[in-house]
């Protein structure tokens, strides 16, 4: 199973995170399948590669709580629901 979760980067006391698609059994700093975004909690900056995130979500990837909150703020789930509606019609 694949999860979308945070991978810690940066210096001590100055953490930044990559949002990655990674196998559930891998450790936090393990090898990821693909980098799908970036999150800096100190500067409150976020970059999301939305088409890639939608690709993984449509194939059953589960976001962690924090990644889900970040994605909601960016409106990823609204795009996911609109994409699914266009597929069925």
From Swiss-Prot:
**The keyword Ribosomal protein is assigned to this record:** yes
- PROSITE patterns with a match to the protein in the record: RIBOSOMAL_S16
Per UniProt, subcellular location reads as: Plastid, Chloroplast
A GO molecular function annotation here is: structural constituent of ribosome
Q: Does the keyword Plastid apply?
A: yes
Q: Where are the membrane-spanning stretches? A: none
Report the record's disulfide bonds.
none
InterPro entries listed in its UniProt record: Ribosomal_bS16, Ribosomal_bS16_CS, Ribosomal_bS16_dom_sf
Main localization is plastid
Mind telling me which GO cellular component terms the entry cites?
chloroplast; small ribosomal subunit
Tell me which Gene Ontology terms the entry assigns under biological process. translation
Pfam family, any one: Ribosomal_S16
Keyword entries, A-Z = Chloroplast, Plastid, Ribonucleoprotein, Ribosomal protein
Output the NCBIfam families linked to this UniProt entry: S16
Name the HAMAP family on file: Ribosomal_bS16
Q: Which family does it belong to?
A: Belongs to the bacterial ribosomal protein bS16 family.
Quote the protein name from its UniProt record. Small ribosomal subunit protein bS16c
Q: Which organism is it from?
A: Glycine max (Soybean)
């Amino acid at each position: 199973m694949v999860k979308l979760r945070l991978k810690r980067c940066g210096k001590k006391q100055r953490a930044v995170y990559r949002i990655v698609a990674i196998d559930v059994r891998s450790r936090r700093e393990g090898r990821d399948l693909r980098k799908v975004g970036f999150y800096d909690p100190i500067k409150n900056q976020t970059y999301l590669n939305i088409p890639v995130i939608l690709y993984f979500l449509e194939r059953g990837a589960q976001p962690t709580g924090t990644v889900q909150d970040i994605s909601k703020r960016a409106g990823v789930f609204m795009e996911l629901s609109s994409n699914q509606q266009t597929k069925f019609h």
